[in-house]
């Protein structure tokens, strides 16, 4: 049996589900994994060998991928990690696009020609994983040398950082996480942040050109505190080195205001004994 223990939010869980299903398919094991909301094919029951023990625990990012698949012994494999390495998934891209086909009830427009830019802010600013505008500007100049429509997907449409994009006259796309992911996957050109949420549309869609950061710090950097992550497809992406982001005073003030507001909302919700749901896409 393959037992998937989900961690964190949607983009991360998609890796965990797919790794579990790949192993189930290759080893002829049963798959135990909750369905991912909005992805109806993840409700499919995967039959196979189902044992409770002996147990093999896989965690972290990088695992001995070849050895795990070559071991045909009967066992229960528990997936309790992140597994964010494109080498595990790219050979299965055709199948994964079927497994993670978004519910047809979810709708989003197609923007062609033009480019969709994923600007991840909020928690990334606090963790120093946000990217500088110089990266986005270079990416847009590279993908749109003669100009064209620009759409921004972001988790904070009020962030003054977005004013840097004014010369591109961008439009802001607003939608649910699934609508946003579908919208990004339908673009012809895509600018990534160092985020799993943005990586998946580039993998699942038919995006012609993808600009990708090579950051000095953050989860996709060589200096990451989470070693083993490797989602940068250097043979497919246009990879652009970028410096660390340094917020302006206005941007810092905005982030402080956000944090104070969020804290007040949390206090109010807890005082009313309501469930706390504060998850930016």
Task: Kindly label every feature range from the protein language model.
Residues 27-40, 154:
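A short beta-strand-loop structural module common to alpha/beta enzyme folds
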Residues 171-175, 228-243:
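Short acidic-hydrophobic, aromatic-tinged amphipathic segments that line or gate anion-handling sites
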Residues 16-23:
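Short amphipathic alpha-helix
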Residues 2, 25-31, 208-210:
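Short helix-capping/linker segments at secondary-structure and domain boundaries
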């Amino acid at each position: 049996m393959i037992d998937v223990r989900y961690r964190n939010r949607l983009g991360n869980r998609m890796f965990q589900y797919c790794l579990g299903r790949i192993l189930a398919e290759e080893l002829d094991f049963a798959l135990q994994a909750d369905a991912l909301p909005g992805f109806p094919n993840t409700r499919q029951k995967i039959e196979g060998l189902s044992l409770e023990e002996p147990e093999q625990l896989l965690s972290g990012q990088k695992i001995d991928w070849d050895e795990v698949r070559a071991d045909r012994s009967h066992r229960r494999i528990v997936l309790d990690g992140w597994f964010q390495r494109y080498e595990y998934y790219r050979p299965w891209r055709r199948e994964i696009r079927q497994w993670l086909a978004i519910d047809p009830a979810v709708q989003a427009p197609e923007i062609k020609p033009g480019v969709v830019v994923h600007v991840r802010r909020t928690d990334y600013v606090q963790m120093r994983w946000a990217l500088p505008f110089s990266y986005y500007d270079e990416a847009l100049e590279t993908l749109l040398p003669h100009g064209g429509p620009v759409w921004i997907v972001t988790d904070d449409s009020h962030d003054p950082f977005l004013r840097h994009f004014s010369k591109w006259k961008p439009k802001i796309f607003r939608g649910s996480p699934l609508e946003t992911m579908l919208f990004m996957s339908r673009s012809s050109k895509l600018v990534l942040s160092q985020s799993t949420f943005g990586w998946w549309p580039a993998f699942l869609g038919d995006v012609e050109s993808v600009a990708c950061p090579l950051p000095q710090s953050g989860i996709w950097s060589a200096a990451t505190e989470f070693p083993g992550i490797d989602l940068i497809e250097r043979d497919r992406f246009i990879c652009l080195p970028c410096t660390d982001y340094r917020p302006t005073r206005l941007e810092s003030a905005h982030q402080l205001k956000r944090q104070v507001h969020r804290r007040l909302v949390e206090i109010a919700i807890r005082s009313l004994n309501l469930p706390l749901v504060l998850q930016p896409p």
